[in-house]
Regions:
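Active-site/ligand-binding-proximal alpha/beta "capping" segment
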Residues: 161-196, 200-201, 210-214
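RNA substrate-binding interface of SAM-dependent RNA methyltransferases
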Residues: 68-163
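Structured adenosyl-cofactor binding patch, chiefly the S-adenosyl-L-methionine
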Residues: 199-240
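Generic structural signal for residues in well-ordered beta-strands
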Residues: 59, 142-146, 212
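Short, acidic/turn-prone active-site loops that include or flank metal/cofactor-
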Residues: 64-65, 194-195, 217-220
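N-terminal positively charged helical leader segments and presequences
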Residues: 1-66, 119
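Mobile, glycine- and charge-enriched loop segments
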Residues: 36, 60, 66-78, 185
């Protein structure tokens, strides 16, 4: 069923306008009576097309319910900035797996080092990828790709979360299963770029409250690590 997102909705007068209306009328060529879903803040509004007039699609509400695909935990991925193609892949797959937001972080070992102005130009495309992935995977929200922040700024954000884990390749960290996520509502996941984190960065995260987690003896690529970690996290929090 076609899926569309909106930030606000009037249940008595649900309609689509702009590019979404054009997509319904011209790309999908939908007719009166055909079903589609409008998502607003994690709620699915299942509707039927009533009529299409100009650049507006008028809808009749059939039922509404909480989106079953939305996790019960709020997960923020703090991803050290990799090369753009890898970041696009990470955004798409992270959204499919249930992340709430993605915060690109500039760390010492980042190979790609865009300045804030250059990165801002890429944000439009990254958020478009997030929207496409949200539609494809049946999400109830479009996860945000936030502006790039410094590592210091990321650590300040971590303090506001219930639990944060840092993936670190050196032995000595806990496994995910040893961390404990019972009753936790907000989780941070901190993952390095191609070069990982240096010891000072890892220690700074631990001092901020992050738990150092080790994924095993195999070294994962930076685009594989978030997929692995998010899959484990969703399983452990009963969100698979």
């Amino acid at each position: 069923m076609p899926r569309f997102f909106t930030n606000e909705i009037d249940e008595e007068n649900i309609c689509l306008t702009g590019p979404d209306a054009h997509h319904v009328g011209f790309s999908l060529r939908m007719k009166a009576g055909e079903p589609l879903t409008v998502c607003c803040n994690g709620i699915d509004y299942n509707c039927n097309v009533r009529s299409i007039t100009g650049d507006t699609v008028y809808l009749d509400l059939v039922e509404k319910h909480r989106c079953a695909a939305e996790p019960t935990v709020d997960v923020t991925l703090f991803q050290a900035v990799p090369k753009l193609d890898k970041l696009e892949f990470i955004v798409r797959k992270s959204v499919e797996l249930g992340v709430t937001r993605i915060v690109p972080v500039l760390t010492r070992r980042c190979v790609s080092r865009p300045d804030s102005k250059d990165f801002a130009k890429k944000l439009v495309r990254l958020n478009k990828i997030a929207e496409e992935a949200a539609k494809q995977s049946g999400r109830g929200i479009v996860p945000e790709v936030a502006p790039m922040v410094s590592y210091k700024e990321a650590l300040a954000m971590i303090k506001e979360l219930d639990r944060t884990v840092l993936l670190y390749e050196e032995e000595g960290g806990r496994s995910f299963g040893d961390v404990g996520f019972e009753g936790v509502k907000s989780i941070g996941l901190v993952i390095g770029s191609e070069g990982g984190f240096d010891k000072e960065e890892a220690q700074a995260a631990v001092e901020t409250g992050a738990v150092q987690v080790w994924l095993g003896k195999r070294i994962l690529r930076c685009e594989t690590a978030p997929i692995t970690a998010l899959s484990i996290l969703m399983f452990l929090t009963n969100n698979m």
